[in-house]
């Protein structure tokens, strides 16, 4: 067998560690068919959310008003994530939380005293961005979505404790909790996966749009960025708003990347895994589990949330 003379090899053809990493990363983030469908649905969510936020007169058109009511309910939920993030960091910094209020027109407000303001103020946007990114990543896998829904239920309990005097918070959280239970039964949990994905996209979009609207496009003196700028004194509110916007976009992208890298299972494999992890009672008989179709599940979510929005 002839020997190989390693000296004749051109070092330029030997891949460098950085090139190997980029090649491996590109392979891991390349979506399979199931992930590609998930990305398409997420893209549709983004387009619908963006259009309805900029065309409020669509309320007068009956079919689109259903979707708009859906959007309002989901937006209130993401506002709840924002306020809950304020409260959570407030508790960690020894603040006293008095109440959390949600309002469909004004957004939300967290009443507290004490704590560290330069931590509690940015926690709203950064916390809801992180939650949105985590939900987007979980939206690529059925079992991960089940875990995410349980974590959301814990968030709901804390929010209800601090917002126990706000009836809108009770209606919203009880309604969303009912939808989580309902979607758990649809398609072996596939509808729950798209519901979690929708809430994740909505949470990230809320942060991006709210920062742009309150800080960059127009200056609101009562915004988190304005209060943070007043406390720090080193930069104007628009600078902090821009920084938070960049961080929110990074979280959004990381949520998608983590989902693509971590959850490569196809639809059939996810269905099998889901049947062994917190399975739906009676799902094996097919009595309670509907056909696991991507777009049917997405439409089920849209219709159900629209009904909730009309209540």
Language-model features: locations:
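Divalent metal-coordination and catalytic microenvironments
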Residues: 82-84, 124, 228
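Terminal transmembrane helical module of multi-pass membrane proteins
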Residues: 185-274
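Hydrophobic transmembrane alpha-helical segments that form the core helix bundle
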Residues: 123-222
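Topogenic membrane-insertion module of multi-pass membrane proteins
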Residues: 1-66
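Small-residue-rich helix-interface/hinge motifs
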Residues: 56-118
């Amino acid at each position: 067998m002839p020997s190989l003379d390693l000296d004749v090899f051109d070092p330029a053809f030997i891949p460098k560690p950085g090139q190997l990493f980029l090649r491996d990363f590109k392979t891991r983030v390349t979506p399979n068919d199931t992930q590609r469908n998930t990305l398409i649905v997420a893209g549709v969510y983004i387009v619908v959310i963006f259009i309805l936020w900029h065309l409020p007169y669509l309320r007068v058109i009956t079919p689109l008003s259903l979707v708009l009511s859906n959007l309002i309910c989901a937006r209130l939920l993401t506002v709840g994530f924002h306020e809950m993030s304020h409260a959570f960091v407030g508790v960690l910094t020894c603040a006293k939380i008095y109440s959390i209020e949600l309002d469909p027109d004004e957004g939300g407000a967290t009443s507290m005293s004490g704590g560290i303001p330069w931590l509690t103020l940015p926690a709203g946007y950064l916390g809801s961005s992180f939650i949105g990114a985590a939900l987007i990543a979980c939206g690529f896998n059925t079992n991960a979505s089940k875990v995410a829904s349980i974590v959301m239920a814990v968030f709901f309990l804390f929010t209800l404790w601090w917002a126990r005097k706000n009836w809108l918070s009770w209606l919203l959280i009880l309604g969303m909790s009912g939808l989580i239970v309902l979607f758990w039964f649809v398609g072996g949990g596939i509808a729950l996966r798209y519901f979690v994905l929708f809430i994740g996209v909505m949470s990230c979009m809320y942060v991006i749009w709210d920062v742009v609207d309150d800080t960059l496009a127009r200056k609101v003196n009562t915004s988190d960025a304005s209060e943070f700028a007043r406390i720090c004194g080193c930069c104007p509110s628009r600078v902090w708003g821009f920084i938070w916007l960049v961080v929110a976009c990074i979280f959004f992208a990381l949520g998608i990347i983590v989902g693509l890298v971590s959850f490569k299972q196809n639809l059939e494999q996810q269905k099998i895994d889901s049947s062994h992890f917190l399975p739906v009672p009676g799902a094996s008989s097919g009595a309670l589990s509907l056909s696991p179709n991507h777009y049917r599940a997405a439409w089920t979510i849209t219709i159900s949330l629209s009904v909730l929005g009309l209540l």
